[in-house]
Amino acid sequence: MRFTLYGLLGFASLLHAAPIAENLSTTLKSLNVNPADFSLWDQRNFLGNPRLTCVVLEKLFGSKSTGVYESGYTALTEITWSQTCWVNPACIVSPANAQDVSKAIIVLRALQTKFSVRSGGHMANPGFSSAGPDAVLISLSNLTKLSLSSDKSIATIGVGNRWGAVYNYLQPYNVTVIGGRIGTVGSALVLGGGLNYFSGQFGLSADTVERFQVVLSDGSIVTATRTKNSDLFQALKGGSANFGIVTEFDLRTRYSGPLYYEAVLYPGDQYPALMKALVEYQRNGSLDTKASLVTSFRVEGNLVVFLYLDPVIRPSAFDPFYSVPSIPFFPPGFATITELVAALGIGFSSEPERDATRVTSFETDESILNYSYGIWQQVVATLPANASLEWVPQPIGAGLKAKGDQYGGNILGLPAKNHIWLDIVAKWKNPADDAFVLNASKFILDKTDAFAKSKNKYLPYLFMNDAYADQKVLRSYGTTNFNKIVQVSKKYDPSQTFQKLQGNGYLWTRE
């Protein structure tokens, strides 16, 4: 026996589900959705049925909802950076504004349908910004609002923007923001902290936020600032998707003048001298917060990019590196942040492949760096064809925590000491190699952690933007901050929709 949607609501009430039926009927009518417009649905597969939900979303959003067999569906699923996230959701809804996001979450909550949310899709963890056939994908790529306050001090950024577009928009005004280091990365990286080339001077991306616009699970659209919903404001700076869907935010700007940059390659046999230079740089050079460096250690060679906030050739902050034999890669020069991001982005392959990142942290220590590098060398020698593991130590200054505290605080629990965020960036072609490559990446950092613990230099903090799916990022913030995340989640999402229906992610209920 089959029923209309109205009939199903009546059937649900007979099963002591009257509140659900009543709320659902009211919800659909409030969105001007007439249940009689839909096909007949089996009452056994009503709530939680992604097919039914997609029919409702198509009726509600029209061309802003894309089904499996529609033109553009495949292209939308393959926006994500890593092929490991190229999966097929039941449908994709692409809201045009916060009001659309509100309608979408109201429908998903009413129909108890699983969902995932995607901004730029650079997160390589399957399910974090992708969804399978049992779920709906909310793509925020159309939320591309960009504006600048009259005094040029605040930039309003829609969460669908990528950082390259943001920098390009702001450059004619001679201002910029503390955003992502790669132009193709989506702006939602702010919710994980967001490491910028000049975070030593200005803090993490999250620390420069002045306002968040957030859609909550009941569909309400709220603002979070240092003085309004201040607990939500702080929790969003590192708390990711536990509270609602961020649709736009305001970032403080800074003057965008010419920057110094230089990139050099170091032969592999120079790694002991390079580690010594890295430690010395953190001990003294990083006290100059205008200085920053980016590292990339690969089988082909070890790349270090030197950056300085002022147009100064070979600043003294980098003195420890100048005596190590090297080969020029980018000669010394000056560039705007827009030009710099574009130039450095050339080094990142645009060819689709399988990607994963994993991270750990420890106090800066030459012996740990040398030990971990040695383990990495052993492991990369065993990799299958068309697979690579990049070893990326990121020096973090002791003052980074204070930068966050200065502007309302964040939820990260950063160590107030010089330390290293060590990333392993995995890239490979063959799905059959998934387990081998992922296990190899984990092995390197497990061994590194064990050695760091033996030296009493291990730090529990995990940088969300570079973490892998199985890492307990929220727990790494410390018990006090984790408990704050739980409290804020329960306050702003009392139905716990984002815990129960949202796909994979760094959610407190899964740690």
From Swiss-Prot:
Annotated positions of the Pros-8alpha-FAD histidine modification: H122
Pathway membership, UniProt: Secondary metabolite biosynthesis; terpenoid biosynthesis
Position of the signal peptide: 1-17
Pfam families: FAD_binding_4
SUPFAM superfamilies to which the protein is assigned, alphabetical: FAD-binding/transporter-associated domain-like
Keyword Secreted applies: no
MF annotations from Gene Ontology: FAD binding; oxidoreductase activity
Top-level division of the source organism's lineage: Eukaryota
EC number(s) stated in the UniProt entry for this protein: 1.-.-.-
Family: Belongs to the oxygen-dependent FAD-linked oxidoreductase family.
Official protein name in the record: FAD-dependent monooxygenase AOL_s00215g279
